[in-house]
Amino acid sequence: YLDIANYREDDPKGVLKQISILTKTIHDNVGAKGAIKHYIEDHGSVPLWVLVNYLTIGNLSYLYGALKDSEKNIIAKYYAEKYMKQYKNSKILRINSKDMESALKIFNLVRNQCAHDERLYNSDYKNIRVSNIANYLEITNYNNRRIVVAILYLKILLNKDYYKKFHSELNA
């Protein structure tokens, strides 16, 4: 993940920025007690699956955007297959890299709204792609400018048990 060759070729500046963020995250946490320190001291490097726990949602969104399309589609396919398996749904869920980018964008927007005490209702998410997910879930009465868009993506991406808990707490 620190090798520029593993990312898109059309935006070298953006890719270098992402690699810089990853490197800085490792640097900032290498002295602290935790997984990064352990992996650096005991293994000489930090696996990506450890590093992502130290990244912000925005960092993850931009990192995903810097990946090659083939890698993005592998990730999207993984989540589609996981959803179909957990919900025992034989209908094929076709989500692609654009859907995943939209999910990460809306999660970042919602997180920032919450962190800065902004309202979530009637928020404008007009540039978020959701029709593919809504059609699959057979939801016809939705508006791209509502928080329900984030909830639709959570249903697809979260483990079923986590989503059920989230949904029940939301309704409480």
Over which residues does each language-model region extend?
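Long, contiguous internal "core" modules enriched in hydrophobic/ aromatic residues
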Residues: 1-172
